[in-house]
Amino acid sequence: LCDTSLQSEWATLMALEEECLRQNRTHRVIVMTDLGDLREGFWDKDELVDVCQRVEQDLPHVHLAGIGVNLSCYGSTKPTPDKMNELVALAHRVEARIGRSLEVVSGGATSSFTLVHWGTMPAGINHLRIGEGILLGKDLQVDWGIRDMDYLRMDTFTLRAEVVEVKDKPTYPIGELAIDAFGRKPTYVDRGVRRR
């Protein structure tokens, strides 16, 4: 169904390698980092770099296409040029470790398109995962004030998913807060690190 997936668990990457070996296929992955939104991704940046190296060296059927981030979702952490520069710097660390350039540095989803729209997306980000902005067109208009996308429909799909990973992460988002994935400005209570 797809040739590239977002990954943030070593166990899942190993299982993917086994299945690719069984099917005699190669699958591309974007390894995710968490830059404060507390959604998916490696929280520990050294661990992310180590995992990227292990994918590169130890998983011949899993191709490390790049790294990525998700922002303005669970934790409502705003996509900013600073957050994107943090991702680009992390990509450079991975590239130095694996000895080649990454094909993909994925700067987020629809909410990150605002940086492109306003001309503030830093160089080095070469990929966005724009789904809602294309399929619904609501968030950019209603939540981010971009009005030139009103030709898009807002009733095109229903998404159902299974929870496939749980991690220990802080309960308070890191970075400048904006809106969450539902257009709300939630308040957070810092309860320390929790399994989620």
Question: Could you describe each region identified by the protein language model?
Answer:
Residues 1-101:
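Active-site-proximal beta-alpha core segment in soluble small-molecule metabolic enzymes
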Residues 83-196:
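Active-site anion/phosphate-binding pocket segments in diverse small-molecule metabolic enzymes
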